[in-house]
Amino acid sequence: MIRPEKMTIKTQEALAGAQQLAARQGNGSIEPEHLLVSLLEQEGGLIAPIIQKVGGAPAALRSAADVLVKRLPQVSGATAQAYLSPALNRILDAAQREADTMKDEFVSTEHLLLGFFADRQCAAARALLDAGVSRDNVLAALMEIRGGERVTDQNPEDTYQALAKYARDLTDLARQGKLDPVIGRDDEIRRVLQVLSRRTKNNPVLIGEPGVGKTAIVEGLAQRIVSGDVPETLKDKRLVALDMGALIAGAKYRGEFEERLKAVIREVAKSEGKVILFIDELHTLVGAGAAEGAMDASNMLKPALARGELHCIGATTLNEYRKYIEKDAALERRFQQVYTGEPSVEDTIAILRGLKEKYENYHGIRIKDSAIIAAATLSDRYITDRFLPDKAIDLIDEAASRLRIEIDSMPTEIDEVERRIIQLEIEKQALLRESQDPHSLERLKKLADELEELKAKSAELKGHWQREKDIIGRVSSLRQRLEEKREEAKKAEREGNLARTAEIRYGEIPAIEKEIADRSAELEDIRKEGKMLPEEVDGELVAEIVSRWTGIPVSRMMEGEADKLVHMEDRLITRVVGQDEALVLVANAIRRARSGLSDPNRPIGSFLFLGPTGVGKTETAKALAEFLFNDDQAIVRIDMSEYQEKHTVARLIGAPPGYVGYEEGGQLTEAVRRRPYSIVLFDEIEKAHPEVFNVLLQVLDDGRLTDGQGRTVDFRNTVIIMTSNLGSQWIQQYGSSDYARMKAMVTETLKEGFKPEFLNRIDEIVIYHALPLEQIKKIVDIQVECLKQRLADRRIVLELSDKAREYLSREGYDPAYGARPLKRTIQRKIQDPLALALLEGKFQEGDTVRVDLSVSGEELVITKK
């Protein structure tokens, strides 16, 4: 009998499983048949793969073994534990002898399988032989799987066929045509080939920003190896990608991870240069598997890399390379850096054109060239925190996905007709209950006619939609077949089967292409009656996706929006009174940006609003936010009175490394990162510390700002508004009497308050005039309108007489303080007495409240009309 400590974990599990099966079936002894069933149903076991390798069918063998178990005698009412039968003891002894013969330290499941053949009279052994499993072919399969390895620990299965378990064969995937085509990147691939062909330190590491195509370069290399487009030294090599997740997952005990990694290194070394190992996210090696006193993965790889036994390609980002690899000089020197830069917009367009067919076939739609150009150019300009070509590919993918969902959904025209039918059916049922009424009968007849008409229309539309959908689906499946045939032709050509290659290329492919053309022509004929389903991704759809991602309106303007922008000043004047010059300057900047004529490397507009308090500087920013975003609170508002100290600059852009709050980011930079298209208002800018202006210089000039964490924040889609009271004394003193002198005095005051390099970067310095009495009357109307809206929620109507309006204008007018005293006057004279009257119950819902001037002309009277 084998001692338990001399069994592998899988052997112990198999025997325990056999014991449980015997107990469940009510058998008095544990037989070889129980053990065979237990071995076949083991997860991650070696027996099922061995049987498959020798040509047997594990599922059929399992069924046969189940039948044998059911035939075993059952004992009812027995409580004693089942014992090992003599037949099973003989198999276990034979397994021990097999382990000794193979010089293995532990009895493994494969030894148990060989043990079955020692007792040919055993029913389980006969079942194995009937399934085509013999001792000789099991030994041959075992040699192939184990590769001459001995069982030296209790978990040997983890180390068998390590590459098959813990790596993906990229060359095999390339042969099957499962990798996306790699366009361009010839310089980087050539550089990788040069490093791989070196005698020593032939391990390139691809370094670049996330999304620039590092993994794609390795996939391109795999495709080149398959097509033979590589130097002689690299021909017929296997490129396998190590799966770190699979390597670490399930390694419960100390040393298991190291065993697995050693097995991978051994298998690569044994291939004598035939296998090139690709480790994506190379930095994950540093610290992987390190526990108390254990080595991490990178230290285990170093000796093999240094000796040249391990051919390896790494890939990692710049930040992670600096953070993990550069700190370990011994690991860094074993790799040769290959820098991978971000491709240009032109290169990205070429890459997208190469990938176009793959995405068309997957989504079953067509992608226009205008969509590809839009994806590359718009993602480059508006999605600044990611890199080409990844962000452009994502745009195309999402646009295609959205179109596919539209094709699969019911068109709006049919949906509207169906809803109308349901509505009329409900109405019909209601009228049927009142069938005695002659008017109801007449209405019923009309309803029946309308329903019949609508149902006929619905059936016609559905038929048209279904025909379109069927043809689009058929064309999609034909395109997929075409791609499969092209891959088959490439495979046949590689294998030297030229007859099959010619048959596919000159027979099958042209036939499929002809059918695609016929179906497309049929679709065009159907669409002459009317197009119901979109089928092409165009530039406009891509622009819409960009708008959804960023909140920046880059899609083509609808007629309504264009008209809105043309009359932008008229809309703003309804909120900001008496400052026409300021509104025209702001409107021009927005129009330039939306028509695509503004400088792409600067903010949409940067303005310095000057003027006395209460004349509408901050209100202009709010009115602009309401115009652009339909929400006057959609402003990144920074009150500069909070930034009077030098150290408060850190609050704007984020604390530097080592300081508290480093992870949180800055108030300005974080707000703009989240909403790249916004209005940034720096209120009362003259109150800020001079250091703050130095931070704003690069925002105003280059439309960018680097935050405390080194990230570049894009300000090119923001409107920057700064307000200040500097020079307001001159504006009030000279006002409209001497505009030229007033402007000269204000400019002098500005030069004293701000540095010339700051003033020189501002697009427009806008001077707000003090408000005359006539303008205050207009503001009364605006303020009272707000009050009317609040009362309308309570269904109370407010009316204001002309005399009351004149009175409020006079009382609320103060040239020194602008419109703010007016707000306080309305609060004091109307809101306070009205609030008291409402609480006393003098006014109810549905009442009309009239505000008039008293006979004395000294106060307002509020009465019910």
UniProtKB/Swiss-Prot annotation:
Region ranges (NBD1): 161-342
Region entry Repeat 1, spans: 7-72
Entry protein name: Chaperone protein ClpB
GO MF: ATP binding; ATP hydrolysis activity
Compartment(s) where it occurs, according to its Swiss-Prot or TrEMBL record: Cytoplasm
Region (C-terminal): 771-865
ATP-binding recorded as keyword: yes
Renumbered residue ranges of the record's region NBD2: 561-770
Coiled-coil spans in chain: 393-528
Keyword Lyase: no
Start and end residues of each stretch annotated as Linker: 343-551
Sorted UniProt keywords: ATP-binding, Chaperone, Coiled coil, Cytoplasm, Nucleotide-binding, Repeat, Stress response
GO cellular component annotations of the record: cytoplasm
Domain remark in the UniProt entry: The Clp repeat (R) domain probably functions as a substrate-discriminating domain, recruiting aggregated proteins to the ClpB hexamer and/or stabilizing bound proteins. The NBD2 domain is responsible for oligomerization, whereas the NBD1 domain stabilizes the hexamer probably in an ATP-dependent manner. The movement of the coiled-coil domain is essential for ClpB ability to rescue proteins from an aggregated state, probably by pulling apart large aggregated proteins, which are bound between the coiled-coils motifs of adjacent ClpB subunits in the functional hexamer.
Residues given in the record as ATP 2 binding sites: 611-618
Family: Belongs to the ClpA/ClpB family.
Region of interest (Repeat 2), residue spans: 84-148
A single BP term in Gene Ontology: cellular response to heat
Underlying gene: clpB
